[in-house]
Structure formats: structure tokens, C-alpha cells
Amino acid sequence: MDLHQLPPSPSPGLVNLIVEIPAGSRNKYEYLAEAGVMVLDRVMHSSVRYPFDYGFIPNTKAEDGSPLDAMVIMAEPTFASCLIKARPIGVLDLHDRGAYDGKILCVPDADPRQDEISSIRQIAASQLEEVAEFFRTYRTLQGGVVSIDGWRDVDAVQPLLDSCINAAN
């Protein structure tokens, strides 16, 4: 799976999202670019599970040096290495070990039930808090420190995405 030719955005308002970790999983997979495969990075040793399909936007470079992280709200989990055309609706701002590590929240373009969702304001506050709590707990259990700075709406996505695309070029 060579991602070098895959654009970060297939068309305006959408991103290409590569799933690394399906919703409900304790297995943490990461894309190994030099081999073009997903590898098992570690197994979380607690009851904490990923709340949504989690992955990255290819051909981007976030402040932490890796591709820009993204999550997609799905009714059913997909699988590691699945390509999803997704519509960003907001950003979870957090700092992991003192460095900014924003996470884009998306809905799948292929799900007509989510056609009308265009903003995190349309997502239940409890669901957004579940995502934030996952990252708090996940890092704490690993002995790390994470601070959740809060959610920003869809208007914050494009500047972050553009910055990460420019950093990758």
C-alpha cells in the first residue's frame, strides 16, 4: 500500500482518511511507510478502547512530525488500512507531552445518514466528551501527560489541514 500518490483531499470539503485503528479496538496499529503495511504497535492493557475509527490523512505532516491524525464517526468499525473519503466537522485540540497534537473529527462521505452533518455542534456533547476522555485516559495509563484544550468547529479544519499539507511538501 503506497500512499505517496494519494492526495490529502480528493475534492473540496473532503479528506482521504486511512484507518489505522478500528473503533472498539485495543490493538494500536501504525502505518509503516517504508514497508507499505500496517504493523501492530502495541496492545492496550486496559479496558480503554478507541471510540471511533482512528487514523491519519496521507501526505500531511503535523507538528509532531507524523501525518495529521483524524477520526471518523461510523455506525460500524471498518478495518486497518481502509481508505475513507470523509468530511471534516471539527478539531480536538490537545497537547501530548507538551506538543500540539490536533485530531480532526470527520463523518464518512459514503454514509447518507450523515449527509446533513457539517459541524461538531450537531454531535452530542457527551459523545465529544467521550472522545476527549479516551485520549486523557489512554495517555495517563501509558504514564504520559496530555492536556485537552477543547473542540473547535469546522472553520478551524482547513487552516490546520493546509498547514500540515504545506509542511509535508
Which residue stretches match the model-derived regions?
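Hydrophobic N-terminal alpha-helices or hydrophobic patches in metabolic proteins across all domains
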Residues: 1-169
